[in-house]
Design a protein with these regions (language model features):
Chain B
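Short, amphipathic alpha-helical interaction segments positioned at domain boundaries
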Residues: 76-111, 168-254, 335-364, 412-456
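A short, conserved structural fragment
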Residues: 58-69, 148, 152-168, 301-302, ...
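Hydrophobic residues on short alpha-helical segments
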Residues: 21-28, 106-111, 260-267, 348, ...
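Short acidic, hydrophobic short linear motifs in intrinsically disordered regions
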Residues: 24-25, 30-45, 116-141, 166, ...
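Residues in the recognition helix of alpha-helical DNA-binding motifs
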Residues: 53, 150, 263, 308, ...
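N-terminal alpha-helical scaffolding segments that mark the starts
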Residues: 1-44, 56
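Intrinsically disordered, low-complexity regions enriched in proline, serine, glycine
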Residues: 36-38, 51-52, 65-67, 75, ...
Length: 252, 532
């Protein structure tokens, strides 16, 4: 429209009807994007306060906080740091406890979404299943696991000599395959593809027992199969990260 | 699924379900229906994480699955919709409504169901009883029957509904459209089940009673879970109807007076069960019925009621209409028209707050007179020409006002064409709705930014609070407590207070914008159903 009117002074639309008078000039053209935070001529109104608004606010913040602690809040697997540290073996299981608390009703979900959780290779026990349908299988397992705890204790002693190198690497799928073959339990269904790609969930023996049998095991040493509490494995990398703003307190 | 909606859904998923679910959810929103393999491949996450995220999304109703489009053998496809995820913004309002209607028990029932997505009745009752028992004094515990009765009341008034049974989750589903909850006749029937027991406190003081209760619970849990898989979910539509009614009543109270709003409230209450959710107006009610159903505290004589009704009918907002003369006059509440008027008032106030009252006058004028020329606008609005032109162009550049060309000749020659200014209410409402979504997304991002900036300070204060709590529990002296409190310096405390104030303001602003979103959404949906 403007290009065609370039050679002549008239514009393509009638100036009268749109309202531009002859003497006035058009406002300057914009050469760049509008500013990100433009100045507002009118300030916005203040928020409505009041009891209801505050109660709604409290409800909202409580809800957000509560959702973080539920099993549906999924944390990604923690990124591995540059160098493997000894304490990783004991720290990595802390985050995954919430995942096993939720036993969904598998009839309402498509079958392909079922996850078969694997136990770490250290135990000689059969693979745990997140299949909630079979309550009877659960009971059989309870009995079986108690017997197998004793067997496990013996095999653990043997295995610790053999697997001293492989212990530190939890994501070792070859170990898992070996264990799968040794396993006497024949009812399990495997997806060929998921067998290769799955990443181990390090669910320890202690946490599973507390889910299946309901015995009140204490946290800490039993959960991680060590004799020390978890702060023993703090590797000192978090020290000194606090604020250095207060320079009048000397740091020794 | 506009870009703003997807962005807001992503932020909501991130806050409530973590970043893994956010990735999977936004991918589904952007790409439509997909099967599991494609999702895994395109998001680049591990198989287990994707499976868990999909389960979480399905559990909360944000994702639906059905057998593939290519036939019974193809893999199941998952699709997600923005609407359900955007409801998360409104959760506090739902919980608060349940509290006002059914007390603390109702509030906790609705909160539990919102947190978990779908739950069985027995599971909900147990959890809520335990939570209530936690807050009660020592020695008292909450009885299951009280919680069950609150649950049943919620189901009877349709605030809760059964989840639709998914026909053969593993097998082929022939119907393309997933069944709605309403298509099942038992949707609102509570199964006949007796739950006997009391809530358990976490730290049990009386072991004997708890053991007895535990035994009885185990027996009853076997009884109740024999009812195969009836899951309950919150019925958002019913809550929305409630909010809509509340909006109409408060609008009448603001425009007229308290008594008229009570009359409208009575009319709406009487038509709660007889009106379908998509109805344009309620069923006609005779003035005699209204008179009989007015609450006892409002004993106004019959002729005064007639005068009020006439006033309501004559009001330009057209909340109430007259549908006939029998029974002393038949009156209806015009629901869709009321929603349209409320949306119009919202648009007008937006223009007023952003551009000033004179621009608002022009806007209202154009809404009423539909099409006006430049000169007519100046005359009717009584604003000098130059300023009127300026304001019109500002409104035009913000797309709140449109230009309509009416040619006099078949070649649209500019000198022989009328240019009329006009406002179309529905497209403008849609545009403002998208602006609202963008606003909420910006508020959330700003809040996350503020918390991230002061993350170290927040963590430090949390640690100190934990230390204080543990010291108090173990009974420490006041000097130790003050020593620990002094670990936070005064400037840090100021910073923390300012941060808390900002975060509260941003959160509160989100709640308020959501009220506008609700109004505009209801209006847009009501036009869709009436024209479609």
């Amino acid at each position: 429209m403007a290009a065609r009117g370039r050679s002549r002074r008239t514009l393509s639309f009638s100036v009268d009807s749109v309202g531009i008078n002859r003497g006035e000039s058009l406002p300057p053209t914009l050469q760049q994007p509008t500013p990100v935070f433009p100045v507002m001529e009118q300030k916005p109104l203040p928020l409505t306060g009041g009891e209801e608004a505050e109660y709604l606010l409290a409800l909202k913040q409580d809800f957000r906080g509560a959702m973080r602690s539920l099993p549906c809040f999924i944390q990604p697997a923690a990124a591995l740091r540059d160098v493997e540290r000894y304490s990783d073996k004991y720290h990595s299981s802390e985050h995954t406890d919430g995942l096993m608390d939720w036993t969904p009703d598998w009839q309402r979900f498509p079958r392909e979404l079922r996850i078969h959780a694997r136990k770490p290779a250290r135990d000689g026990v059969s693979v745990a299943r997140s299949d909630a349908q079979s309550a009877q299988k659960k009971k059989k397992k309870k009995v079986r696991e108690k017997e197998e705890v004793l067997i496990k204790l013996e095999t653990l002693q043997k295995k610790e000599e053999q697997q001293s190198e492989e212990d530190d690497d939890d994501d070792n799928t070859e170990q898992k395959k070996k264990q799968e073959d040794d396993d006497a339990d024949g009812d399990e269904e495997y997806d060929e593809e998921e067998f290769e790609e799955v990443i181990l969930y390090v669910t320890c023996d202690g946490s599973n027992q507390s889910v299946w049998t309901g015995s009140g095991l204490t946290e800490g040493s039993v959960l991680q199969e060590t004799d020390y509490i978890m702060s023993y494995f703090d590797n000192g990398e978090d020290f000194g990260g606090d604020s250095d703003d207060n320079m009048d307190e000397a740091i020794y | 699924m506009t870009a703003q909606e997807v962005r807001l859904c992503g932020l909501l998923l991130h806050e409530h379900f973590g970043e893994v679910v956010e990735k999977v959810g936004t991918h589904l929103l952007r790409s439509g229906a997909q099967n599991l393999r494609t999702i895994i491949h395109e998001t680049g996450l591990s198989v287990d994480l994707v499976k868990k995220s999909l389960m979480v999304l399905v559990q909360h109703g944000a994702c639906l699955f059905s057998s593939g489009r290519k036939g019974p053998g193809s893999p199941t496809e998952y699709r997600s919709g923005c609407d359900r995820i955007l409801r998360i913004l409104r959760y506090p309002r739902y919980i608060y409504t349940a509290k006002t209607l059914y007390g603390d028990t109702g509030e906790l029932v609705v909160e539990e169901l919102l947190q978990r997505g779908h739950m069985t009745m027995s599971g909900t009752v147990k959890t809520v009883a335990d939570r209530l028992t936690q807050n009660m004094e020592e020695g008292r515990s909450m009885d299951y029957s009280e919680v069950s009765s609150a649950f049943s009341k919620l189901v009877e008034t349709h605030f809760l509904q059964r989840c639709p049974k998914l026909a053969g989750a593993g097998t082929a589903d022939t119907s393309a459209i997933p069944p709605t909850p309403e298509s099942f006749p038992d949707c609102y029937k509570v199964p006949h089940m007796t739950l006997v027991g009391r809530g358990k406190r976490q730290l049990a003081a009386e072991d004997g009673e708890d053991q007895r209760n535990a035994k009885r619970q185990k027996m009853d849990s076997e009884n109740s879970e024999s009812v195969p898989g009836i899951y309950w979910q919150v019925n958002f539509e019913r809550f929305h109807l409630h909010f809509r009614d509340q909006a109409i009543i408060s609008a009448v109270a603001n425009k007229l007076d308290q008594t008229s709003s009570e009359i409208v409230r009575t009319m709406l209450r009487m038509s709660e069960v007889t009106t379908s959710p998509a109805a344009t107006c309620t069923k006609p009610l005779s003035a005699n019925e209204i008179f009989r159903s007015l609450p006892a505290s409002y004993n106004i004589p019959r002729p005064i009621l007639d005068q009020y009704l006439t006033l309501l009918v004559d009001d330009p907002m057209e909340f109430v209409g007259k549908a006939g003369e029998s029974g002393g006059g038949m009156y209806v509440v015009n629901l869709h028209r009321a929603l349209a008027n409320l949306a119009r008032a919202t648009l007008e106030s937006v223009v007023q707050e952003r551009f000033g009252s004179r621009s608002a006058r022009i806007f209202r004028l154009l809404l009423r007179k539909r099409h006006l020329e430049q000169k007519q606008v100046e005359d009717f609005a009584m604003i000098p020409a130059k300023e009127a032109k300026d304001m019109l162009y500002t409104l035009l550049s913000q797309n709140l006002v449109q230009l309509q060309e009416i040619p006099k000749t078949p070649d649209y020659a500019p000198s022989r064409t009328f240019y009329l200014y006009t406002v179309n209410q529905l497209p403008t409402a849609r545009m403002l709705l998208q602006n609202c979504y963008k606003t909420v997304a910006n508020l959330i991002e700003r809040r996350l930014f503020e918390s991230k900036e002061s993350k170290r300070l927040l963590e430090k204060s949390q640690r100190i609070e934990a230390i204080l709590a543990s010291l108090q529990a173990s009974g420490a002296e006041p000097e130790q407590l003050t020593e620990v409190e002094e670990m936070i310096t005064a400037p840090e405390k100021q910073q923390l207070d300012a941060l808390k104030l900002h975060i509260n303001k941003l959160d509160s602003a989100e709640n308020q914008v959501d009220e506008t979103i609700f109004l505009l959404e209801s209006y847009v949906n009501s036009t869709a159903t009436s024209t479609g």
